[in-house]
């Protein structure tokens, strides 16, 4: 281990050995926010975005991202996920996305939750590009921000 990093030693980069760990209930919750024009948030709530159902698309994208996290983050272990929930809270000029991931396994699921929330936010951006662009084709208001883990659980039961 180099400087307290579990993925690096004197031989280089490695995937951490977890074979000796017990299988326990794991949960992680991550949140993030996309700032949008108030008019865009209203259109999403009313289901009037021409490209399609923004929230359903974001949910599917987030769930797929959770399942593919070890393909995107090189040193993540493939984890048998037991459940994923992607939910939304609305403000006047933003949508906050929450991704909750659950599993019974030997290592945590926080990277999966972070990946899920980030890709869900990116999917929202993709779905609303046409209404968020200004006259020069730029996105002066649109921002993805504050992606973070809000809860991490490790317990020998699911409560």
UniProtKB/Swiss-Prot annotation:
This protein's pathway: Cofactor biosynthesis; molybdopterin biosynthesis
Gene3D superfamilies: Molybdopterin cofactor biosynthesis C (MoaC) domain (3.30.70.640)
Keywords: Lyase, Molybdenum cofactor biosynthesis
Molecular function (Gene Ontology), one example: cyclic pyranopterin monophosphate synthase activity
GO biological process terms on file: Mo-molybdopterin cofactor biosynthetic process
Superkingdom in the source lineage: Archaea
InterPro entries the record matches: Mo_CF_biosynth-C_arc, MoaC, MoaC_sf, MoCo_biosynth_MoaA/MoaC, Mopterin_CF_biosynth-C_dom
EC number per UniProt: 4.6.1.17
Enzyme's top EC category: lyase
Catalysed conversion reaction: (8S)-3',8-cyclo-7,8-dihydroguanosine 5'-triphosphate = cyclic pyranopterin phosphate + diphosphate
Residues at the catalytic site: 126
Entry binding sites for substrate: 75-77, 111-112
Recorded family membership: Belongs to the MoaC family.
NCBIfam families: moaC, PRK09364.1, PRK12343.1
PANTHER family (alphabetical): MOLYBDENUM COFACTOR BIOSYNTHESIS PROTEIN 1, MOLYBDOPTERIN COFACTOR SYNTHESIS PROTEIN A
Protein name stated in the entry: Probable cyclic pyranopterin monophosphate synthase
Organism the protein comes from: Pyrococcus horikoshii (strain ATCC 700860 / DSM 12428 / JCM 9974 / NBRC 100139 / OT-3)
Gene: moaC
């Amino acid at each position: 281990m180099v400087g307290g990093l579990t993925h690096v030693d004197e031989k280089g980069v490695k995937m951490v050995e977890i074979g000796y760990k017990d299988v326990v209930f794991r949960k992680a919750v991550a949140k993030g926010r996309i700032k949008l024009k108030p008019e865009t948030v209203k259109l999403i709530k009313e289901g009037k975005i021409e490209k399609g159902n923004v929230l359903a698309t974001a949910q599917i994208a987030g769930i797929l991202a959770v399942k593919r996290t070890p393909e995107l983050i090189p040193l993540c272990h493939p984890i048998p996920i037991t459940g994923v929930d992607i939910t939304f809270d609305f403000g006047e000029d933003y949508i906050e996305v929450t991704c909750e991931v659950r599993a019974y396994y030997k290592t945590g699921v926080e990277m999966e939750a972070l990946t899920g929330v980030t890709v869900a936010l990116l999917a929202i951006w993709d779905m609303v590009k046409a209404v968020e662009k200004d006259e020069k084709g730029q996105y002066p208001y649109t921002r993805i921000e504050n992606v973070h883990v809000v809860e991490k659980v490790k317990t020998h039961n699911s409560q």
